[in-house]
Amino acid sequence: MTPSLGYWLLVYAAVAIIALIVLIARYRLNPFIVITLVSLGLALVAGMPPSAVVGAYEAGVGKTLGHIALVVALGTMLGKMMAESGGAEQMARTLIEKFGEKNAHWAMVCIAFLVGLPLFFEVGFVLLVPIAFTVARRVGVSILMVGLPMVAGLSVVHALVPPHPAAMLAVQAYQASVGQTLLYAIAIGIPTAIIAGPLYAKFIVPRIQLPTDNPLEKQFLDREPRDKLPGFGITMATILLPVVLMLIGGWANLISTPGNAFNQFLLFIGNSVIALLLATLLSFWTLGIAQGFNRESILKFTNECLAPTASITLLVGAGGGLNRILVDAGVTDQIVGLAHEFHLSPLIMGWLFAALMRVATGSATVAMTTASGVVAPVAIGLGYPHPELLVLATGAGSVIFSHVNDGGFWLIKEYFNMTVAQTFKTWTVLETLISLVAFALTVGLSYLL
């Protein structure tokens, strides 16, 4: 590919993203249709063979939905059981009691930081969002006041803190120490989550006016109040089961011999889909039968909670299709090649590569994996003394500027019932704050070591 053609690819991609935003935000066109049309148009303009365009888009949608559809469905069922049984109400009461109503946003960032450790962002989100809705209602604040701190905690853990799967990929690539990375990540992650979560929420929420009618909120809150609520312990155990199982799966090769039957069993139950499935089945007993619901009621709950997730699932899949087009058209390769032209320190290179890949692909995990794979050989060759900081810098870059090609962007938009413009002002800025603050703290830490 000639340099001029490569630069034009970047121009085409930028125009496509701008067109996407304008058509959805300004002209109020259906987001799924717009993403599909823009993705196919970009592929054709970028020179992809017409016969391969639809296949590439379908592959991107299918790959994304193959995981996300199951996660959203199972997580929504688990959330519905928490809501109907009063488990979410019990957790909300306990959190408010311990932290106080004025500090509910601090409670949400703390629980997200803990629950999100072994979970991909989407899994943690669907697990915790019923609690966020319930806390917001009880305290009488906008869902954004507790929801933004929640997603800040989840995102910080996703980007920085092992044993989260995304962070572990970078730890392996850079040959970093898990223990030291964990220590540095906590030191950097806590202030980052505070700034991007509770503090930013206090600033932006008064400036965002949400519609009063939120169909997704209704399915968690519009129910008859129950006299008897499940205990906090059993509710917490149910929601933490997938967390524990995924932690076990993440450490399977360290606590068992790779390849043997026990190791395979641990990897199986530690898979996010299996872990959520087991937790959902457990909730049918702990939050269903044990609370006086019969099988017909549980069937009704699980059926009615899925309909509102259809649009979310489609939008997340469409974002995956756009992601695949950007990769197959050569846009991501061009970004990597362009960044190679600048001779930067490994720390800056790790952040910059990850940031560019994040903007291009929409996936924090893909950005972290790709960037660490590119930068690690350079850093190792230069003998960079602190590979743990490279993990953190790469993780910080991987969450910058979430926009329309990121499934998480649409997940946040739909669940919190925001417009595209409001999602940029809240979620996109929050993610960018996490990236910049975490990177600044990482650079600062590098001068102290």
Predicted regions mapped to residue ranges:
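Hydrophobic core segments of alpha-helical transmembrane domains in multi-pass membrane transport
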Residues: Y12-I24, T36-V45, V72-M77, I111-V115, ...
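Alpha-helical transmembrane segments of multi-pass membrane proteins
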Residues: V72, E101-L117, V139-A159, S177-P191, ...
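Membrane-core helix-loop-helix motifs of multi-pass transport proteins
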Residues: T134-V243, F409-L445
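Hydrophobic alpha-helical transmembrane segments of multi-pass integral membrane proteins
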Residues: A69-G75, K98-I131, T313-G319, F342-P377, ...
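Core transmembrane alpha-helical segments of multi-pass membrane transporters/permeases
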Residues: I33-T36, L40, A56-E89, F268-G330
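Membrane-interfacial loop-to-helix junctions in multi-pass transporters
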Residues: Y7-V11, G62-I68, L95-V109, R138-V146, ...
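Long, contiguous bundles of hydrophobic transmembrane helices that form the permeation core
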Residues: T2-Y7, L183-K300
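C-terminal transmembrane helix pair
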Residues: F99-K102, P346-L449
